[in-house]
Amino acid sequence: MKQQQSIGGFFELEIAQLGHSYHLDAFALTNGRACLSWILEREKPSIVYIPYYVCSAIYIPMEKMGIKYVFYDIDIFLNPINLPEPQEGELLVLINYFGLKNNFVNNISKMWGKQVVIDDTHRFFNRGYSNSYSFTSARKYFGVPDGAYLYGASNINTEIDRNKNISVIHNVKRLLGLQEQAYEDYLTYEDSLGYEIKRISILSEKLLSCLPYSDIARKRIENFHFVHEELKEYNRISINIS
């Protein structure tokens, strides 16, 4: 539905949409919680299997919907122990921890298809899986108020309302060098984020269309190699990144 434009008054924030989203084939929602909520509403699973090492944002939507969830164990290398095999009407959530479990989640996705939900919030530059649901988060990588990308969804209602309940106060204060104040505002904003299924805000959509993604990806890899070189003697997890 096209939004009516007002005439007169003052000028809006000027942001040119210079390019396009990195995730053109995904559906852009507000955050990872909204993506997961959409999947749960669509599939209506009887049971969802989730790892013990997980953010509460994963299981809170299940509690709100009255969906039973069961934890499974992982070892110190972030590998599942006795991974449950989802039966008909059940879902298995896999966390691609820090983007390090790519081969594993790919293999499980091929085995169980749409019964697998992959939390890819630590791997922004992956564009989904051919068989399974997955989602990633823009807010974990960039200074935007909202934004997450859902893959594997079909027949999605494109008339879902856009998110307008956003704040960029913390982003602006950090830009101005007011880190401590910005962090307090960030925590307040985080607490305000819900699980309602809404499309990404127009502000985040435009901001994310202006980013030089290739340069950003290269710089993130350089940063990783620098930190890894300093800390590798303490790290018990084998890390291989190009």
Protein language model features and the residues they cover:
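PLP-dependent aminotransferase-like
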Residues: Q5, G9-Y22, A34-W112, F124
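PLP-dependent aminotransferase class I/II
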Residues: S6-A16, H20-F27, V54, V93, ...
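A short, well-structured juxtamembrane/interface segment
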Residues: G32-C35, N223
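Structural motif
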Residues: Y49, L91-L94, V117, F135, ...
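Short hydrophobic/aromatic-enriched beta-strand-loop microsegments
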Residues: K68-D73, I118, S134-T136
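A basic- and aromatic-enriched beta-loop-alpha substructure that forms the phosphate/nucleotide-
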Residues: L91, F98-N107, V117, T121-N126, ...
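A short, gly/pro- and small-residue-rich
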Residues: I108-V117, A148-N155
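Active-site PLP attachment segment
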Residues: N131-V172
